[in-house]
C-alpha cells in the first residue's frame, strides 16, 4: 500500500510539470487576443426624418489590417440593451444587412454609415454602434457612446372624403359667382343699348306737293 501511495503521489507532480508549460503558452496566446479594446465614435444626437429614417456615421480605430468586420446596432432602454440589427462584411465587399430590412449601411475604410428605417415615436432612444474586427487576429471590439435618436410621428392626413366635400363646395361657389357676374354684365349691356332708340318712328312724307296727301305720318310706341 505504501508503494502504491508513493507511486500515486509521484505521478501527479510529473503530470503537472508537463502540462504547466502548455497551459501557460495557451494563456499567453489567447488572453491578449480577447483583451484588446478599440475606440468607436458616433454623433450624440440625430433627428429622424418625417418618414422615420435616421442616419449616422460610426467611426472606429482600425489597426490597418482588418479584413473581416462585424457591425452591430444596439438600442438601450433603461438598463436593458437589445440588438436592432447586425452584419458581418469583408473590407473588399460592400456592407449589407441581408436578413434585416430595418437597417442599411455603407462602409468606407474605418467608417460605417448606418441608416435605420421605419422608426416611430416610440422608437426614440439611445442607439449604440458596436464594431468587431473579426479577422485576422488579434480580435478588437469597440462600442460607441451612443446616438440619441429622436423620432416625431407626422400628423395624420385629413379624411379624403372631407377634402372632396370641400372641393365640391368651392367649385359650386365659383360656378354660381361666375353665373351671377355674367347675368349682371348682360343686364348692364341691355340698359346701355336702350337710350339709342327714341321709342317713336316717324315716316317723313315726300317733299313734293303732289304726294303730300298720299302719305300720313305714324308712330310705333315701344314699351
Curated annotation (Swiss-Prot):
Post-translational modification: N-glycosylation is important for dimerization. Phosphorylation at Tyr-201 prevents binding to the AP-2 adapter complex, blocks endocytosis, and leads to retention of CTLA4 on the cell surface.
Localization terms from the record: Cell membrane
Residue(s) carrying Phosphotyrosine: 201
Domain Ig-like V-type: 39-140
Chief localisation class: membrane
Residue numbers spanned by region Homodimerization: 46-50, 150-155
Keyword S-adenosyl-L-methionine in annotation: no
SUPFAM superfamilies: Immunoglobulin
Topology Cytoplasmic: residue spans: 183-223
Keywords attached to this entry: Adaptive immunity, Cell membrane, Disulfide bond, Glycoprotein, Immunity, Immunoglobulin domain, Membrane, Phosphoprotein, Signal, Transmembrane, Transmembrane helix
GO cellular component, one term: plasma membrane
InterPro entries registered for this protein in UniProt: CTLA4 (IPR008096), CTLA4/CD28 (IPR040216), Ig-like_dom_sf (IPR036179), Ig-like_fold (IPR013783), Ig_V-set (IPR013106)
Keyword Disulfide bond: yes
Region (Important for interaction with CD80 and CD86): 134-139
Pfam families assigned: V-set (PF07686)
TM segment ranges: 162-182
Membrane topology, record value: Single-pass type I membrane protein
Signal peptide: 1-35
Oligomer and partners: Homodimer; disulfide-linked. Binds to CD80/B7-1 and CD86/B7.2. Interacts with ICOSLG.
The protein's name: Cytotoxic T-lymphocyte protein 4
Organism from which the protein derives: Canis lupus familiaris
Amino acid at each position: 500500500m505504501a508503494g502504491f501511495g508513493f507511486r500515486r503521489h509521484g505521478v501527479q507532480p510529473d503530470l503537472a510539470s508537463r502540462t504547466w508549460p502548455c497551459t501557460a503558452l495557451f494563456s499567453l496566446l489567447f488572453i491578449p487576443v480577447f483583451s484588446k479594446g478599440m475606440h468607436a465614435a458616433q454623433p450624440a444626437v440625430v433627428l429622424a426624418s418625417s418618414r422615420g429614417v435616421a442616419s449616422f456615421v460610426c467611426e472606429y480605430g482600425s489597426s490597418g489590417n482588418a479584413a473581416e468586420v462585424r457591425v452591430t446596432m444596439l438600442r438601450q432602454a433603461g438598463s436593458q440593451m437589445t440588438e436592432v440589427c447586425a452584419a458581418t462584411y469583408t473590407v473588399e465587399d460592400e456592407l449589407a444587412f441581408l436578413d434585416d430590412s430595418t437597417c442599411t449601411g455603407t462602409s468606407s475604410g474605418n467608417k460605417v454609415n448606418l441608416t435605420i428605417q421605419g422608426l416611430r415615436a416610440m422608437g426614440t432612444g439611445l442607439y449604440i454602434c458596436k464594431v468587431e474586427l473579426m479577422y485576422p487576429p488579434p480580435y478588437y471590439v469597440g462600442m460607441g457612446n451612443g446616438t440619441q435618436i429622436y423620432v416625431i410621428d407626422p400628423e395624420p392626413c385629413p379624411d379624403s372624403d372631407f377634402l372632396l366635400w370641400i372641393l365640391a363646395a368651392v367649385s359650386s361657389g365659383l360656378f354660381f359667382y361666375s353665373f351671377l357676374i355674367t347675368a349682371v354684365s348682360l343686364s348692364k349691356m341691355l340698359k346701355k343699348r336702350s337710350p339709342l332708340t327714341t321709342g317713336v318712328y316717324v315716316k317723313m312724307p315726300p317733299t313734293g306737293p303732289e304726294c303730300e296727301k298720299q302719305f300720313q305720318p305714324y308712330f310705333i310706341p315701344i314699351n
